[in-house]
Amino acid sequence: HFELIKLYGAAVPYVDDIAMKENVNPQVSNVDENGNYIYIWDKIVEDLQFAYDNLPDTWTEAGRVNKWAAGAMLAKVKMYQSSPYNGKNGTSNHWTEVKTILEDVIANGKDNKGTKFRLADTYEELYTAGESDWTGESVFDVQAAVSGTVEQTANINGAWHIGFSGALGTGGWGFYQPSYDMVNAHIVDANGLPKMDDSYRNDPALSTLDENNLPHTDLTVYTDPRLDVSTGRFETPFLDWTVPNALDGWVRDVSNGGLYLNKKNIPRKADKGSLSNTTQTNSTAKNFHLI
């Protein structure tokens, strides 16, 4: 429901577990029997508050949501609830509650291995299969695993266009490319500080095509080092695969998706067969970090 609000606003109906059990395609109104609007934010907060109040600190099953993951998600929802995402009600103020919850999570939170939350040693570590799951920084993950033998593990119910999201050069289908705006937001000044005035939006693209349709990247521009963990760029190493130097084999349609490559959730070539699927190389054991 939280993700639906992000996309469509708070007018989406609230479908609870009971309605789903009674009907696989429930028809749910966003008003109650008296015609009053059902405020979906309150329903989401109520659900997460119950989880935060009642879940244990840790579970023996590593991937289950514990008290601290629920608390962090509750705080995130309350932040969005107090923002323009809440439409005309975006002036509602839950920041004091958010601060209280997050102070509790920071002071006392731990993962299911009992590791107290902390910042990972490096940003890259968060997106390295086998290391990223239990750095202490991951609060709420979508768990992932591969056997090394099962084919098409990235495809839920045959959803090919979702599963093959990696760069073409790594076995993906080239979808979900980083945008110009996202990449330019990593431009920094000589002191390593971001351009807080949004002037990066008017800066030239860091990667361009020459008259022969060959891609080039301007590496003289100062950028936040996290950029090359998140985004593949031409003329820079793409993990341990190779250095992309031509469109062919890397970009599906440059006129549609641009020149940047999906990278941070893509497995390394060395992972193939152990932390990545043997047949579809972009299937990976990297967890997806929600928080």
Predicted segments with their positions:
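Aromatic-anchored glycine-rich loop motif in surface-exposed flexible loops
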Residues: 1-66, 78-93, 97, 245-248, ...
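An aromatic- and glycine-enriched ligand-binding surface/loop that stacks and positions planar moieties
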Residues: 41, 49-50, 64, 68, ...
